[in-house]
């Protein structure tokens, strides 16, 4: 994902500072995007996937205002966390097969969003998609395991992603040193083990 052209330029998770994270005002978002476009060190944006569409308010607006030269990534963490509020076993690593299949459907929608961006801007417009090894686990609740995550990874890898890399965004895991994790997804060791297979 690093090229000579990308050195000194960054993928920015600007959505977290957007004036329209929870409400929609097209004018203020346009000002915000135009300011982002003026920053030469921005290589692309980390675009949040909330679970239903490319943009939480207006897909066409995003397609009309995203810089066509940017190389972006789609992060599925926001949508995953939203799902987990009501479906605590939701995720690619879920030991509950129905919840794991629901996560696969979620990622199929994300896959379609990636293709929508690529069809509009070209193949280089989405260089990666961040996935997670949800759901939660600790010493009392064990909703996830490496084998379920591996099964999901194999299914996602069978889709035609082209030049878009599937990237596991490691989140905090339950350990003796971290007995009350915020997310509590799989350990990095289990994630790496699943990826290697």
Segments from the language model and where they lie:
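N-terminal pre-domain/capping segments
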Residues: 1-112
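Active-site acidic/histidine proton-transfer and metal-coordination neighborhood
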Residues: 1, 86-196
């Amino acid at each position: 994902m690093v090229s000579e052209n990308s050195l000194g330029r960054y993928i920015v998770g600007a959505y977290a500072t957007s004036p329209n994270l929870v409400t929609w005002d097209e004018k203020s978002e346009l000002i915000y995007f135009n300011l982002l476009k003026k920053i030469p060190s921005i290589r692309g944006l980390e675009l949040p996937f909330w679970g239903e569409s490319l943009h939480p308010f207006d897909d066409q607006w995003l397609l009309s205002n995203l810089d066509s030269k940017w190389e972006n990534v789609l992060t599925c963490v926001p949508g995953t966390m939203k799902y987990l509020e009501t479906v605590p076993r939701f995720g690619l690593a879920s030991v509950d097969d129905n919840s794991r299949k629901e996560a696969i459907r979620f990622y199929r929608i994300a896959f379609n969003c990636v293709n929508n961006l690529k069809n509009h801007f070209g193949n280089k417009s989405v260089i990666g998609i961040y996935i997670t090894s949800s759901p939660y686990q600790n010493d009392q609740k064990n909703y996830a395991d490496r084998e379920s995550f591996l099964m999901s990874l194999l299914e996602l890898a069978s889709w035609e992603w082209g030049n878009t890399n599937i990237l596991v965004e490691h989140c905090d895991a339950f350990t003796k040193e971290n007995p009350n994790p915020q997310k509590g997804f799989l350990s990095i060791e289990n994630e790496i083990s699943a990826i290697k297979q």
